[in-house]
């Protein structure tokens, strides 16, 4: 049995007399790790100094987590980067001059021969250029810009970029992107700097159109829709344009781009017009011909000329598609054409006038909901002629309401070839066969520049009092995964 007095003497003994236990570190160096020996926090560690291995003492590489597998080691583990004496002292003047010159010439060449809005990820196949390859908003965290489309292939004003990254929210990649600046930063940048040529000091590179999209850096959320420029002018930031600006940030500041992406995946917030500005807007440009129910019943005196627009649709399809595609569309039309004929053959002129009044009255009612829904929405007739375009749809695609409603425009004109074929097949199924009249589908929208935006959409078919398809209400959202 241990004597109590002996135990007390040991406890009261000075600490210096005890054997010192080396403090363990959570991360051993490569040599101590291989030898399974205790290491310390200093670099080089004491054991490496004793063995004359101080120059090569590094933290042992750790096994990467799955979500970091495609990120370079120097980014995933900054501690792996060790400062050498040369790095501490800095490069010589001649080296510094040469590297700065090369950086400037590289940026200038990139500006001349590439357009950031047409970056296409080689594996994702999403947002596309005019050559037909698909472009969906997908952002790449890679620094490889070899797949940038030459500027000569770009002939539009609004950028429609691609964006790809392997983060929680993936735009077939993902939109885990970098906010370019805080909202207040936009007003702090000098206009002449925004339009200047890129240089070694131009961190973010040249600004397209001289404006940066607003972004909440704390949530990585970009703002699209109606806004004001730095000089107070009203403007609309479209989805394709904002994506192109994100790609520009990724190109000119890739390290900062990756760092910010770790915070959260990108998201978008669609701004709404203020009450003051909405009162001043021309409501007729949405597609509404009548703004009061009394106007509808007093001014509509003739039926709508559906046959005329069917002929216009057929002429357009013949100009755009080859024979094989036309045959496929004709087969789909042949399925519902007899039902249309049977449903309308007994209708009188007053009935046809009444159906047009119902169409305009329904459109007027839907305008109240669409204008506050915040979802990109369009409405078209059974001839596929656009009858109503929501403001959010213009923000999503880059089309203006004047372009879509200033003339007779068909929904198939802003769909890619595959989506047009799918449209007729889908319409033939829901026109008379599916009395629920609503279906989810995936389609690809075209921007004014010919780029493609993959979207998921829901189409709701509305019938008139005679059971004949009257209009299709379609809601679109860009595909992020």
From Swiss-Prot:
CDD domains: GAL4, PAS
Domain of life of the organism encoding this protein: Eukaryota
Any one GO molecular function term: RNA polymerase II transcription regulatory region sequence-specific DNA binding
Function, in words: Transcription factor which regulates nonfermentable carbon utilization. Activator of gluconeogenetic genes.
Gene Ontology biological process terms from the UniProt entry: carbon catabolite activation of transcription; carbon catabolite repression of transcription; cellular response to starvation; gluconeogenesis; positive regulation of gluconeogenesis; positive regulation of transcription by RNA polymerase II
Keyword Zinc-finger applies: no
DNA bind region: 29-57
Species annotation: Komagataella phaffii (strain GS115 / ATCC 20864) (Yeast)
Protein name: Transcription activator of gluconeogenesis ERT1
